[in-house]
């Protein structure tokens, strides 16, 4: 159960997706600009959420922003024949959220991170991209499970 202004984890992921997606068009150069992007998001202001970055959505946004190079490296390992700059912005943002959760959130099982990315792809992405997203995330999850990829907590 969530209280007014405190989104569920799925809603927090959706909020993080929207802000991170927007940052793809106008990147933040500092944490201050990242906080401003959060506070000015219509999904924060229009839904009565605190403009102060907090909670799970903010953790995802700040963590992905901070660790983007590492996250993109992992995505690159498993996106056979696809360079990061060739992956669609929606798909890349969804992949970044899920890979971040797999690597940096021990409380989120990889299967949950994959399922949540696929659910968000139904809301924001193209149906044809789900197999692509699932393939990359499944390969990353198997590498984590097999010890070839290490959590970075």
Swiss-Prot record:
Keyword vocabulary terms for this entry: RNA-binding, Transcription, Transcription antitermination, Transcription regulation
GO biological process terms, semicolon-separated: DNA-templated transcription termination; transcription antitermination
Cysteine pairings via disulfide bonds: none
Alphabetized Pfam families for the sequence: NusB
GO molecular function annotations of the record: RNA binding
Gene Ontology CC terms: cytosol
InterPro entries (alphabetical): NusB-like_sf (IPR035926), NusB_fam (IPR011605), NusB_RsmB_TIM44 (IPR006027)
Reported function: Involved in transcription antitermination. Required for transcription of ribosomal RNA (rRNA) genes. Binds specifically to the boxA antiterminator sequence of the ribosomal RNA (rrn) operons.
Similarity-based family: Belongs to the NusB family.
Protein name in UniProt: Transcription antitermination protein NusB
Species: Nitratidesulfovibrio vulgaris (strain ATCC 29579 / DSM 644 / CCUG 34227 / NCIMB 8303 / VKM B-1760 / Hildenborough) (Desulfovibrio vulgaris)
């Amino acid at each position: 159960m969530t209280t007014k202004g405190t989104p569920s984890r799925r809603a927090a992921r959706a909020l993080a997706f929207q802000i991170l997606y927007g940052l793809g068009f106008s990147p933040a150069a500092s944490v201050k600009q990242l906080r401003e992007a959060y506070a000015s998001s219509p999904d924060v202001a229009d839904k009565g959420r605190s403009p102060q970055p907090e909670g799970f959505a903010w953790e995802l946004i700040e963590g992905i922003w901070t660790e983007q190079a590492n996250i993109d490296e992992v995505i690159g390992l498993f996106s056979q024949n696809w360079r990061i700059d060739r992956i669609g912005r929606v798909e890349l943002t969804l992949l970044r959220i899920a890979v971040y959760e797999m690597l940096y959130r021990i409380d989120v099982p990889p299967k949950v991170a994959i399922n949540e990315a696929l659910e968000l792809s139904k809301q924001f992405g193209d149906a044809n991209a789900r197999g692509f997203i699932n393939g990359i995330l499944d390969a990353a999850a198997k590498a984590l499970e097999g010890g070839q990829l290490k959590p970075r907590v």
